[in-house]
Structures are given as C-alpha cells and as structure tokens.
C-alpha cells in the first residue's frame, strides 16, 4: 500500500511517521508514504506555486501547472491505479466505512491544499474524490491527510498489538464505542468512582451484553443519526430495538 502526499509542508508529516503504533507500518514499508514538496515543481526562481485569484478577493490560489507537474511525477513513479483525493470542506465526510475501503485498496494520492484553495481546473481534470474532516475550516489539507493515514494504517494486519482493538472501535459496527475502565477498581466513595460490577464478573456473555447496551445508549443520546443509519442497514437486532425502545433519553 502506498500513499503519495502532495504538500507545501512535508515537515508536518515527519514526526507522525516516526511515532506511535502506526510507526512500525511506515518504517517497514507495509504502508509506504512518499512526501512530495510542491515547490520543487515550480519553475520560476521564487518557487511560486500560487497567485492572485481572477475576479479579485483575498488570499491566493494554488496554480494548476506546478500541481500537474507534481502529479505527473507521482504517476510516473507509482502508476495510475491510486485515486487522487483532495481535502476540502466541500467534500464528503470522512467515515469509517470509507476508511475501510481505502484500507483494502492500493493507497491514494493525497492533495493538501493551502491558501484560498486550488484552481478549479486542476480539480476538474484530476481529482477523483473530495473528502472533508468536518464542518470547520483548517489552514490546509495536511491535518486531514494525517487523519486519513492514521485511520487507514491502523487497520492493516499486524499494526495494532491486539488485532481485536480496531474491531471494537467507534464506528466499527456503525455505533459509538462503549466506555472502558482499568485499574484501580475504585477511585473514591461515589458509585461513579467504581468500575461497573459486570466488568469484574468474568462472565463474557454479560460483559458483551453490557457493552452493547452502552453502545446503543451512548449512540442514541449523542448521535441518533447513526442509530437511524444502523437501522436502515439492518444492523440492529430485535434485542437492540427493544433496548432502544426502553431508553429514557
């Protein structure tokens, strides 16, 4: 799996590639990440990759020609199979479903915009997919690219110490995750300071039932849209529906 990142700030990626549980995948080449400095593809003495927008207005627009030279270099080295992904608030929301699809593919070319944006002609010619990290504005596409790299890499075989870890993540089954507890068993005298007794019981079926109940309760309270989506996908059992009907939210 290979990711080629087109960016004006490759140095933002270096610490990420050498830290955390995903580091093993990057350093071994299991997930190969190539960083491409867009200024290397500017042809003037000033390494200019942006200019003023036609029609006026604030800010600068990233130019088509340096981007196309960079993309040609990527395709010459990596081939044409990987989709070109542009990060923008206008894109489709990044979801765990899309992350899983990308994790099963060959990789992608990640385009990190800056300034007021990228000349639409480059987007129209070359971009295969646009993805948004959320309904807010960032200074560039580097943070969404880092988020996608992390999300995809942790799904690769052997990256996490426990292969079951990502199977219990939020969104792995369309719902939010349940609460987690560790030692000590009690932090204080209040009931909320104690680990729920069911988790100490050693009864696996009861633990699984409690976790599912918590997932449903938290998701219904905080993200009811995910409950609707799970229901539409047929992912809720009759027992799930009975529990949801009994909740006092």
Curated annotation (Swiss-Prot):
Keyword field: Cytoplasm, Methyltransferase, S-adenosyl-L-methionine, Transferase, tRNA processing
Catalytic activity annotation: guanosine(37) in tRNA + S-adenosyl-L-methionine = N(1)-methylguanosine(37) in tRNA + S-adenosyl-L-homocysteine + H(+)
Compartments in which it is found: Cytoplasm
GO molecular function list: tRNA (guanine(37)-N1)-methyltransferase activity
Membrane spanning residue stretches: none
EC numbers for this chain: 2.1.1.228
Residues annotated to bind S-adenosyl-L-methionine: 113, 133-138
One Gene Ontology cellular component: cytosol
Keyword Cell membrane (UniProt): no
The keyword Transferase is assigned to this record: yes
Gene Ontology biological process: tRNA N1-guanine methylation
NCBIfam families: PRK00026.1, trmD
Functional description taken from the UniProt entry: Specifically methylates guanosine-37 in various tRNAs.
PANTHER family: TRNA (GUANINE-N(1)-)-METHYLTRANSFERASE
Subunit architecture: Homodimer.
Protein name: tRNA (guanine-N(1)-)-methyltransferase
Organism field: Leptothrix cholodnii (strain ATCC 51168 / LMG 8142 / SP-6) (Leptothrix discophora (strain SP-6))
């Amino acid at each position: 799996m290979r990711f080629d990142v087109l960016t004006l700030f490759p140095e933002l990626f270096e610490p990420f590639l050498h830290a955390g549980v995903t580091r093993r995948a990057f350093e071994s080449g299991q997930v190969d990440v190539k960083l491409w400095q867009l200024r290397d593809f500017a042809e003037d003495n000033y390494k200019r990759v942006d200019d003023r927008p036609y029609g006026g207005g604030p800010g600068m627009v990233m130019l088509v020609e340096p981007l196309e030279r960079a993309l040609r270099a990527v395709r010459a080295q990596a081939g044409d199979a990987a989709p070109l992904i542009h990060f923008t608030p206008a894109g489709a929301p990044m979801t765990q479903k899309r992350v899983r699809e990308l994790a099963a593919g060959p990789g992608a070319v990640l385009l990190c915009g800056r300034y007021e944006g990228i000349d639409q002609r480059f987007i129209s010619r070359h971009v295969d997919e646009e993805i948004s990290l959320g309904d807010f504005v960032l200074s560039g596409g580097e943070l969404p690219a880092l988020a996608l790299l992390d999300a995809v890499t942790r799904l690769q075989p052997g990256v996490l110490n426990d292969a079951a870890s990502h199977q219990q993540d939020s969104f792995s089954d369309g719902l939010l995750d349940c609460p987690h507890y560790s030692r000590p068993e009690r932090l204080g005298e209040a009931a909320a300071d104690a680990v729920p007794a069911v988790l100490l019981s050693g009864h696996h079926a009861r633990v699984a039932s409690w976790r599912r109940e918590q997932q449903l309760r938290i998701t219904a309270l905080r993200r009811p849209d995910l409950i609707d989506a799970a229901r539409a996908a047929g992912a809720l059992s009759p027992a799930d529906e009975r529990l949801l009907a009994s909740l006092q939210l």
